[in-house]
């Protein structure tokens, strides 16, 4: 697995994260970040990465100029893996916390991390997670006014956009 763009482009991520993690492919990440770069840009943005797994999404945001990334995952092996990369690469603007992504605000408060609005919230919950709409409702207060909420989910899932300010 490698970083697809930005300052850290082509750096390889060791694959010593938990077995149940399913990192986004290089092609998917490259498409996602090309779209973000084209429509909004990342430079100086704050990012919340939930269900962060391997940490690859956080690293892609940092590589492209995010000023701060907060990653939350409940798996200890994933957290240790992310902290190992953070320390060996000297990534001071990457904050990593072990906790439940659904209670992200409480987790950030517990670790004394800023809960100021995020420009991007990326969530990659398990595909069988019930109540994705509930997750959206919990995350909306953490999102900046013109922020992007990006959730990976089953193709057949339809979110209720009336109860949020979601566009697409």
Mark where each language-model region is.
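Class I S-adenosyl-L-methionine-dependent methyltransferase catalytic core
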Residues: 1-165
């Amino acid at each position: 697995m490698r970083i697809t763009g930005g300052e850290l482009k082509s750096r390889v991520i060791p694959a010593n994260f938990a077995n149940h993690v399913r990192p986004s492919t290089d092609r998917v990440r490259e498409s996602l970040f090309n779209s973000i770069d084209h429509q909004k840009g990342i430079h100086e943005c704050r990012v919340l990465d939930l269900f962060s797994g391997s940490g690859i999404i956080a690293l892609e945001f940092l590589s492209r100029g995010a000023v701060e990334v907060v990653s939350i995952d409940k798996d200890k092996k994933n957290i240790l893996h992310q902290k190992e990369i953070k320390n060996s690469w000297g990534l001071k603007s990457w904050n990593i916390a072990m906790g439940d992504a659904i209670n992200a605000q409480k987790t950030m408060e517990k670790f004394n991390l800023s809960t100021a609005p995020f420009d991007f919230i990326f969530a990659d919950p398990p595909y069988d997670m019930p109540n994705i709409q509930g997750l959206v409702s919990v995350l909306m207060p953490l999102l900046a006014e013109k922020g992007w909420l990006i959730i990976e989910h089953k193709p057949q899932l339809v979110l209720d956009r009336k109860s949020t300010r979601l566009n697409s």
